[in-house]
Amino acid sequence: MRLSMIRILLAEDDAAMRQYLERALERAGYAVTGVDRGTAALPLLETERFDLLLTDIVMPEMDGIELAQRAGAIAPDMRVMFITGFAAVTLKAGKAVPQAKVLSKPFHLRDLVLEVDRLFDIGSASGLN
C-alpha cells in the first residue's frame, strides 16, 4: 500500500491531542511517530527519514517554527505542516517557513487527513485547490 510508506513525525505537547491526531492519521494509512516536544523530534530527524513534519507551533523548550527551521536543515525535502490555535502565530509561521501549510485549530480530523493527502497528491484530494 502506497500510504504505508509515507512517514509522519508529529510534534504536539498536548498528550490527548497527539493521540487523537496519531489515531486519525494511522487510520488513514500513514505511519506516525509522535513526540511531545520539538527537542524530542530533532534526534529522530537525524536518524530516521520522515516525509512530513506535522507540528504544533506553541510548545515548551522549542516552538514548532524553530523545529521546522532546524528540520529543514537536516531534511530539506521533508514537507512541513503547522497546527495552531493562535492566529498571530499563523502569520509568524507563514513568514518563517513560507512553503509550510498551516492548519488552524479547531479543525475536523477529516480536514487534517485531506490536507495531508493533498500534500502527497493522494486520493480524491488530488488536483484540488
Segments predicted by a language model, with ranges:
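Receiver (REC) domain active-site loop signature in two-component systems and cognate sites
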Residues: 59
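Acidic catalytic/metal-coordinating carboxylates
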Residues: 36-40, 63-67
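Active-site residues of response regulator receiver
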Residues: 56
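Non-catalytic signal-transmission and effector/linker regions of two-component phosphorelay proteins
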Residues: 1-9, 110-129
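Charged docking surfaces used in two-component/phosphorelay signaling
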Residues: 19-27
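Conserved acidic carboxylate
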Residues: 12
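Short hydrophobic/Thr-rich beta-strand motif most characteristic of the beta2 strand and flanking loop
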Residues: 29-36, 44
